[in-house]
Amino acid sequence: MTAQPQTLKIRRPDDWHIHLRDDEMLSTVLPYTSEVFARAIVMPNLAQPITTVASAIAYRERILAAVPVGHKFTPLMTCYLTNSLDVKELTTGFEQGVFTAAKLYPANATTNSTHGVSDIPAIYPLFEQMQKIGMPLLIHGEVTDAAVDIFDREARFIDQILEPIRQKFPELKIVFEHITTKDAADYVLAGNRFLGATVTPQHLMFNRNHMLVGGIRPHLFCLPILKRSTHQQALRAAVASGSDRFFLGTDSAPHAKHRKESSCGCAGVFNAPAALPAYASVFEELNALQHLEAFCALNGPRFYGLPVNDDVVELVRTPFLQPEEIPLGNESVIPFLAGQTLNWSVKR
C-alpha cells in the first residue's frame, strides 16, 4: 500500500474566476485570495458593471490598494459585454493590457447581470474582433428562457448558443465557466485547444441532494445551481483525467449573511478561504494528486498564453478548520464548509 503524502508542493496557483466585490466586502475577502493565489480573473459584475477601460483601471487600483502587505497578487481585469459595447473600447482595453478577457453574461442569468446581453448574435461583431486579436471570451453558460427548467439551462446553452458561436468563430478562445453538468464536461473534452473550462470546488464536492435533503442549505446555493449526482461524478472524472482543458476557477462569490439566509437568498458561495485545501481533498479522493498542480497552476496560464508562476505553495496534511463566519463590519460572511475540517492546509 502506497503511503499517503504528507506534503504537496505545487507552483503557486491562479484563480481563473472570482468575485471580489467592492468597498468593505473587497477589503474583507481579498486577503483570502491574495495570500494563496498569484493572479485572479476578476469578474466585472459590480452593481455598476465594468464596461470601460477607465472603470477597469479604477477597479484594479481599488483592488491593489486592498492587497495586504507581503502578498504578491495581480488582478486580471475583465470587460462586461453589453448590447451596446463599443468594439473600440474592448480592443483598446485588451491592447493596453487592461482587459485580459471579456465576460458574457446572458441578461439576468445571475447576480448583477441585468446589464448583460439579451441578443447574443447581435454582438457577433465583438466576437469577430476578439477572435482577431486573441482575446478570450468567458461565458456564463446558461440560457435564461423562463420556460427552461433551472437544472437544464446549462445543457440547453450548449446547443442553442455555445455551439453556434464556436462554429462561426472557430479560433475564438472560449472559457466555459463553472461547468456543472456531464453535458458540459463531455463537450469540453470533445473540443479543441480553443475551448477550456473552469470547475468550482463546490460542484466537485457536492450535488443538489446536499443542498436540499434534510433542510435547505443556502450557503451551497450558487448559479449555475448544483446538479444531480451523475453530473457531479462526471465533473470529478473530467478533472481526474488530467485533461489540460480544465482549470481552477473558484467562482468565489461572497454575500453578507443576511443576504444568503433570507426568504429570497442570493446565489453565490464564498469558498476562497478553503479553496486550495478543498481541491486537494477532491483530487486525493480521486487518486489524482498527480494532476493537481496542472489543474491549479499550469492549464490556466497555458490557455491564456501567460507564464506560469515561479514560486510555489506547500500543502501540508494538517487539519484545517474553517471558521463558522468571518466578520464584515457589523455583519458577517459565511464561508464554504463553515465549521468543517479539511485534511489539507496551506503552509503559511
From Swiss-Prot:
Active site: D251
GO BP terms: 'de novo' pyrimidine nucleobase biosynthetic process; 'de novo' UMP biosynthetic process
Pfam family, one: Amidohydro_1
Catalysed transformations (reactions): (S)-dihydroorotate + H2O = N-carbamoyl-L-aspartate + H(+)
EC number: 3.5.2.3
GO CC entries: cytosol
Residues engaged in binding substrate: H19, L20, R21, N45, H140, L223, H255, A267
Known cofactor(s): Zn(2+)
Molecular-function GO terms, alphabetical: dihydroorotase activity; zinc ion binding
Pathway annotation: Pyrimidine metabolism; UMP biosynthesis via de novo pathway; (S)-dihydroorotate from bicarbonate: step 3/3
Keyword Metal-binding belongs to the record: yes
Cofactor note: Binds 2 Zn(2+) ions per subunit.
Modified-residue entries (N6-carboxylysine), positions: K103
Binding site for Zn(2+) 1: H17, H19, K103, D251
Superkingdom, natural source: Bacteria
Keyword annotations: Hydrolase, Metal-binding, Pyrimidine biosynthesis, Zinc
Ligand binding (Zn(2+) 2): K103, H140, H178
Gene3D superfamilies found in the cross-reference section: Metal-dependent hydrolases
PROSITE patterns reported in the protein's UniProt record: DIHYDROOROTASE_2
Family annotation (SUPFAM superfamilies): Metallo-dependent hydrolases (SSF51556)
Functional description taken from the UniProt entry: Catalyzes the reversible cyclization of carbamoyl aspartate to dihydroorotate.
Subunit architecture: Homodimer.
Family recorded in the similarity comment: Belongs to the metallo-dependent hydrolases superfamily. DHOase family. Class II DHOase subfamily.
Name of the featured protein: Dihydroorotase
Originating organism: Yersinia pseudotuberculosis serotype O:1b (strain IP 31758)
